[in-house]
C-alpha cells in the first residue's frame, strides 16, 4: 500500500475550496441567456464547444489531489442534477459554491459544523416547500415551448420542435435526439408501435416503389417459436383467406416449407400475407410480444401456455388498422387492444421502471412504455459543422429534459427569481441555536447566487439587480437579462421547471453540507519523478532521431 498524505482542518478546507472554485468558475460562465461557451480539448478529433454545465464539470480533472477532491464533490452535484432532472446543472454548481464558501467562513469563525449542516437542511426544506407552493401546472403547448426555449439558451426553434414532439407523442412518449446529415433541424414522429425488424422475404412487398408492405385492417399472429411446419399453419391460413383480410405473422423465425408456401401463395394466389421476426431477445422478447398482443387485442401464442399452433383460432389473433413493414422496421398503427388492458400494462411497466437499478433496463422499459402509450419522436439536429451540431445537440438534450420536468412538477419564474423569493421566506425560520440560524443564513445568502451570476454574465451588476428584484412584492417580477428589462418573467416566457430548481438546491446543499463538515482529507502521496521512467535517456528513445 502506497504512503498517504493527510491534511487537517483549515488547510484541508482551503485546498478543497480551491478545487470547488476552479470547477465552479469554469461552469458558471455558461449560466443564463448571455452565458458564454466553454471549449473542451479532446484527445482525438476537433475540440468540443458546449454551454452544458455538467459536460464542462465532467471534463475537469485537477493535478493537486486535495483540490481535485473538492472539484469532484461539486461535479457530483452537477451529475446528480443531470440524472434527476436532466437540467439545472449550472445552477446547482453555482449554489454549491456559494454554500461551501459561506460555510467555510462560518467554520473558520469557530461555529459548530454539525449545527451549520442542520441549519442548512432546515432551510432547504423550507425552500422546497415554497417552490412547491408557488409552482404552476403546465397547461398549454406555448408554455412547453417557452421552457424548451429557455433551457436551450433562448433558441426558440428548439423550443418549438420540442413542444410539437410532446404534443404528438404525449408525456409518456419517447423523444430521441440525433445528429442530422443536413443544415436543417427536423422532427420525425413515428405513431403507433414500431420495432426494429423488417420482412423476412422481399417477396412479401406490396408497394414496390417504396419497397415495403402496407396492409390495412390486418390480422396479426404473434408466435414465440419458429414456424417451419406448414401443417400447423394451414387451418389458420384457410380461416384468414375466408375473411379476405391480410395476415401479418410475428414469430421467432419463419423458414423451410412454411416460408416457401407463404411466398408462393402471396405471388400466385394473391394471399395477403407477410412475416417478420420477433423483436428483442430472451425474456425481453417475451415481454415485447406480450406488449404487441395487448396493443392489438390478440394473444401471444406460446407453448408455455399450452396453446398449440394448429389449435389457434381467428379470435386469438390481434387486429390493427394499419401495418407497415419495410426492410428494417415494422410499424403497427391503431391496434385493436382494449384501453383498460393497455393502461394496466403501462402501469406495470412504470412500476418496473421505478424498481430497476440498471440504466440499460430502464432505457429499454421506457422505450416499451412509449411504444404502448404514445409514440416515438426523433429530433434530427442540423448544423454547418460537426462542432456546431454537437453543441446544438447538447442544448436540445437539456431542453428536452427540462420540458419533461416541467410537465411532471410544473413551472416557476426563471432567471433565479424563484430562489430569490424563497430566500425571503427564510427570514423568520425558527432554529434551536445560533449556529443553526447561521446555517439558515448561509442558504439565504447563497440563494441569490444564480440570479447574480445570470446578471454578471449579461454584463450587469449582480447586487443591483438582486436588490431591485427583491424591492417588488410581485412573485414573478424579475430581470430579463436577454432584453435588459424588468417585468413579469412568466408573461415574458422566462420560466424554469420546478423539478429542476428543486433538485438543484437539494443536491447543492447536500454536497456542500458534507464539504463544510469535513475535518480531514487523505490522498496518495505523489510518486517521486524518475523511478517509473524505465531509464530512458532524454531526447526520445531512438538515437539520431532528434529533428
From Swiss-Prot:
Kindly give the PROSITE patterns that the UniProt entry links to this protein.
Answer: CHAPERONINS_CPN60
Keyword annotations for this protein, in alphabetical order, are: ATP-binding, Chaperone, Cytoplasm, Isomerase, Nucleotide-binding
Q: Name one Pfam family in it.
A: Cpn60_TCP1
Q: Which GO terms describe its cellular component?
A: cytoplasm
InterPro entries, A to Z: Chaperonin_Cpn60_CS, Cpn60/GroEL, Cpn60/GroEL/TCP-1, GroEL-like_apical_dom_sf, GROEL-like_equatorial_sf, TCP-1-like_intermed_sf
**Where is this gene product found?**
Cytoplasm
Q: Which GO terms describe its molecular function?
A: ATP binding; ATP-dependent protein folding chaperone; isomerase activity; unfolded protein binding
Q: What class of enzyme is it?
A: isomerase
Q: Where is it mainly found?
A: cytoplasm
What's its EC? Answer: 5.6.1.7
Q: Which HAMAP family match?
A: CH60
Protein name as annotated = Chaperonin GroEL 2
Which organism encodes this protein? Rhodopseudomonas palustris (strain ATCC BAA-98 / CGA009)
- Gene designation: groEL2
Amino acid at each position: 500500500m502506497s504512503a498517504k498524505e493527510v491534511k487537517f482542518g483549515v488547510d484541508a478546507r482551503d485546498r478543497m475550496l480551491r478545487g470547488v472554485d476552479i470547477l465552479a468558475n469554469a461552469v458558471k460562465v455558461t449560466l443564463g441567456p448571455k452565458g458564454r461557451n466553454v471549449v473542451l480539448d479532446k484527445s482525438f478529433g476537433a475540440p468540443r464547444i458546449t454551454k452544458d454545465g455538467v459536460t464542462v464539470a465532467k471534463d475537469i480533472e485537477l493535478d493537486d489531489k486535495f483540490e481535485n477532491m473538492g472539484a469532484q464533490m461539486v461535479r457530483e452535484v452537477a451529475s446528480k442534477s443531470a440524472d434527476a432532472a436532466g437540467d439545472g446543472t449550472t445552477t446547482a454548481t453555482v449554489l454549491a459554491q456559494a454554500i461551501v464558501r459561506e460555510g467555510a467562513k462560518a467554520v473558520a469563525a469557530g461555529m459548530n459544523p454539525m449545527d451549520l449542516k442542520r441549519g442548512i437542511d432546515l432551510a432547504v426544506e423550507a425552500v422546497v416547500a415554497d417552490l412547491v407552493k408557488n409552482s404552476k401546472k403546465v397547461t398549454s403547448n406555448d408554455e412547453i415551448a417557452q421552457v424548451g426555449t429557455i433551457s436551450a439558451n433562448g433558441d426558440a426553434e428548439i423550443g418549438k420542435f420540442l413542444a410539437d414532439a410532446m404534443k404528438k407523442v404525449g408525456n409518456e412518449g419517447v423523444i430521441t435526439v440525433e445528429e442530422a446529415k443536413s443544415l436543417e433541424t427536423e422532427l420525425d414522429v413515428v405513431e403507433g408501435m414500431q420495432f426494429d425488424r423488417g420482412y423476412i422475404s422481399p417477396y412479401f412487398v406490396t408497394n414496390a416503389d417504396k419497397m415495403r408492405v402496407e396492409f390495412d385492417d390486418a390480422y396479426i399472429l404473434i408466435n414465440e417459436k419458429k414456424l417451419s411446419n406448414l401443417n400447423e399453419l394451414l387451418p389458420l391460413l384457410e380461416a384468414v383467406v375466408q375473411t379476405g383480410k391480410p395476415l401479418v405473422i410475428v414469430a421467432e423465425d419463419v423458414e423451410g416449407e412454411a416460408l416457401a408456401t407463404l411466398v408462393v401463395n402471396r405471388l400466385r394466389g394473391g394471399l395477403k400475407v407477410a412475416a417478420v421476426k420477433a423483436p428483442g431477445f430472451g425474456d425481453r422478447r417475451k415481454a415485447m410480444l406480450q406488449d404487441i398482443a395487448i396493443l392489438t387485442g390478440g394473444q401471444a401464442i406460446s407453448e408455455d401456455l399450452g396453446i398449440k399452433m394448429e389449435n389457434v383460432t381467428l379470435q386469438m389473433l390481434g387486429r390493427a388498422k394499419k401495418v407497415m413493414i419495410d426492410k428494417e422496421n415494422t410499424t403497427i398503427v391503431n391496434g385493436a387492444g382494449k384501453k383498460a388492458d393497455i393502461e394496466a400494462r403501462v402501469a406495470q411497466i412504470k412500476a418496473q421502471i421505478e424498481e430497476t437499478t440498471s440504466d440499460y433496463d430502464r432505457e429499454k422499459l421506457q422505450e416499451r412504455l412509449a411504444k404502448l402509450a404514445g409514440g416515438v419522436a426523433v429530433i434530427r439536429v442540423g448544423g454547418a459543422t460537426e462542432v456546431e451540431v454537437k453543441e446544438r445537440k447538447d442544448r436540445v438534450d437539456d431542453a428536452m429534459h427540462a420540458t419533461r420536468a416541467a410537465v411532471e412538477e410544473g413551472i416557476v419564474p426563471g432567471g433565479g427569481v424563484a430562489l430569490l423569493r424563497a430566500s425571503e421566506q427564510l427570514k423568520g425560520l425558527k432554529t434551536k441555536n445560533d449556529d443553526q440560524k447561521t446555517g439558515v443564513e448561509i442558504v439565504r445568502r447563497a440563494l441569490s447566487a444564480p440570479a447574480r451570476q445570470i446578471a454578471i454574465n449579461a454584463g450587469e451588476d449582480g447586487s443591483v439587480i438582486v436588490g431591485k428584484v427583491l424591492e417588488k412584492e410581485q412573485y414573478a417580477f424579475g430581470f430579463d437579462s436577454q432584453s435588459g428589462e424588468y417585468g413579469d418573467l412568466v408573461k415574458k416566457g422566462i420560466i424554469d421547471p420546478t423539478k429542476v430548481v428543486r433538485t438543484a438546491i437539494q443536491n447543492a446543499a447536500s454536497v456542500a453540507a458534507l464539504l463544510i463538515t469535513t475535518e480531514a482529507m487523505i490522498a496518495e502521496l505523489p510518486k517521486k519523478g524518475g523511478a517509473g521512467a524505465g531509464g530512458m535517456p532524454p531526447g526520445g528513445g531512438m538515437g539520431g532521431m532528434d529533428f
